[in-house]
């Protein structure tokens, strides 16, 4: 696979962010998540790192991995960074964590594997 120097680093940032989020919410209910502001802020910060890292991944890698919702992730970054004053829906964040991150983690593990061959 052809890639730009730095792609592997950014892919690793995505994977690390997902793993960190998973460690924060292990054995946590939605109610606990929504009421624990420190945990919520830590998860939001890692989602920002994840989204920011995907924006720095080269077009080559993005084209070779069209199943990843690159635009949606970029849009999430913009919401997390720019809409913080209006509040971010904890339910939406919880749904991303529970429904989207597991598959995203698999996809980025595959990208990492292909970049290290």
Predicted feature descriptions by range:
Residues 1-117:
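Solvent-exposed interaction patches of small proteins and small membrane subunits
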